[in-house]
Amino acid sequence: MPAYHSSLMDPDTKLIGNMALLPLRSQFKGPAPRETKDTDIVDEAIYYFKANVFFKNYEIKNEADRTLIYITLYISECLKKLQKCNSKSQGEKEMYTLGITNFPIPGEPGFPLNAIYAKPASKQEDEMMRAYLQQLRQETGLRLCEKVFDPQSDKPSKWWTCFVKRQFMNKSLSGPGQ
């Protein structure tokens, strides 16, 4: 079974480094254009997460795949936090905190995927990439809470938390031991 790839890459999609700046249906401020379709890259990443997380190798077919990879790795980080939460409201607070926490971007020493991501070419591109990744993180965390928490019990679903120990591409956005 092959890995799932993003279908959202258009020829006129703007790039930051070698990552696609894709439109989002987001309530958070950031450089991403507004998405008018029903599905955006965050929906796609959440939908494909359970299948893609099993892959140790992932062939990048376009720049949107790099965005998909980042969100997939971020979902893994989110699940580590969400499994410890007792309620959806606690989970939303954790996701907000994780979303705005200082994080490395491509080209910086702590970023785990510097081999496949180009670092920003200028200070302006650096700021735009950081803002876009933060917008992705915030939106992903919020939407993931909607999927992970069971509305009846207000507890994290075991069908999501069972993926906590899985590492997509044998990588993690957090450092070793975190």
Curated annotation (Swiss-Prot):
Gene Ontology cellular component annotations, sorted alphabetically: Arp2/3 protein complex; cytoplasm; lamellipodium; nucleus; site of double-strand break
Keyword annotations of the record: Acetylation, Actin-binding, Cell projection, Cytoplasm, Cytoskeleton, Isopeptide bond, Nucleus, Phosphoprotein, Ubl conjugation
Keyword Nucleus: yes
Family matches, as InterPro entries: ARPC3, ARPC3_sf
Location of Phosphotyrosine modifications: Y47
Compartments reported by the entry: Cytoplasm, Cytoskeleton; Cell projection; Nucleus
One annotated GO molecular function: actin filament binding
Main location: cytoplasm
Modified residues (N6-acetyllysine): K56, K61
Biological process according to GO: Arp2/3 complex-mediated actin nucleation; regulation of actin filament polymerization; regulation of synaptic vesicle endocytosis
Covalent cross-link Glycyl lysine isopeptide (Lys-Gly) (interchain with G-Cter in SUMO2), where: K14
PANTHER family: ARP2/3 COMPLEX 21 KD SUBUNIT (PTHR12391)
Function: Component of the Arp2/3 complex, a multiprotein complex that mediates actin polymerization upon stimulation by nucleation-promoting factor (NPF). The Arp2/3 complex mediates the formation of branched actin networks in the cytoplasm, providing the force for cell motility. In addition to its role in the cytoplasmic cytoskeleton, the Arp2/3 complex also promotes actin polymerization in the nucleus, thereby regulating gene transcription and repair of damaged DNA.
Similarity annotation: Belongs to the ARPC3 family.
Assembly description: Component of the Arp2/3 complex composed of ACTR2/ARP2, ACTR3/ARP3, ARPC1B/p41-ARC, ARPC2/p34-ARC, ARPC3/p21-ARC, ARPC4/p20-ARC and ARPC5/p16-ARC.
The protein's name: Actin-related protein 2/3 complex subunit 3
